[in-house]
């Protein structure tokens, strides 16, 4: 298998000021990895470089052997943002409708949902432990339930790599424990490569 994430002498600068300096590391298939650091330490920049949202000033960042900034095989990559988008919380969408978005092809918002993938939606909600919440309004969910909904959405494509940005921020202790149990299962049983971005080393080490 190709290495999911590789940084090779990667530098990145904002306004000529280096933020990421000569970074070299690889995340191998099936690995559970974490990018840790306090706010302002550059971990979000590293994540954006890994996902091709930023291009390194020099050096290379590779996703499955391809330059991250020109990577196109996005069904292999799942991304879980830190919080539910405000629009998803305001509009009367159900959990199932939000998870359905994971089946859209590419990142085209006009792409047609493929009905044949509806079974994947059910499987993803079950893996995230929210199958009993399918018809609930997003606005009625707790923070922890919303986070599991976003994870389910990212799992519909059956990704090889799952990147999570501060996944337990604002989640209570019970929700955090459920999250860690679920993520360990995804990594151990399905072999998904997991990358957690967090400022809290305790949350990662649990």
Where are the predicted features?
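Catalytic Walker B motif of ABC-type/P-loop ATPase nucleotide-binding domains
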Residues: 162-165
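H-loop/switch region of ABC-family ATPase nucleotide-binding domains
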Residues: 198-199
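Conserved ABC ATPase "signature" region
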Residues: 100, 115-133
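Conserved catalytic motifs of ABC-family nucleotide-binding domains
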Residues: 158
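Conserved ABC transporter NBD signature motif
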Residues: 59-73
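The feature captures the beta-strand-to-loop junction immediately N-terminal to the Walker
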Residues: 36-38
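Helix-to-loop junction immediately C-terminal to a conserved catalytic motif
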Residues: 51
């Amino acid at each position: 298998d190709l290495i999911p994430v590789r940084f090779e002498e990667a530098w990145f600068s904002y306004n000529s000021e280096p933020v990421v300096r000569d970074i070299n590391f690889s995340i191998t298939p099936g690995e559970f990895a974490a990018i840790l650091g306090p706010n302002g330490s550059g971990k979000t920049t590293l994540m954006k470089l890994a996902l091709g949202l930023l291009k390194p000033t020099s050096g290379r960042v590779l996703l499955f052997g391809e330059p991250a900034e020109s990577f196109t095989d996005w069904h292999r990559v799942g991304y879980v943002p830190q919080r539910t988008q405000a629009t998803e919380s305001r509009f009367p969408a159900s959990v199932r409708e939000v998870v359905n978005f994971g089946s859209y092809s590419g990142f085209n918002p006009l792409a047609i949902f493929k009905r044949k993938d509806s079974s994947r939606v059910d499987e993803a909600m079950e893996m995230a432990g929210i199958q009993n919440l399918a018809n609930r309004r997003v606005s009625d969910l707790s923070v922890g339930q919303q986070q599991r909904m976003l994870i389910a959405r990212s799992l519909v494509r059956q990704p090889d790599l799952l990147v999570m940005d501060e996944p337990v921020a604002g989640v209570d202790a019970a929700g955090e424990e459920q999250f860690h149990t679920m993520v360990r299962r995804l990594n151990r049983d399905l072999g998904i490569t997991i990358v957690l971005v967090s400022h809290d080393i305790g949350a990662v080490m649990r």
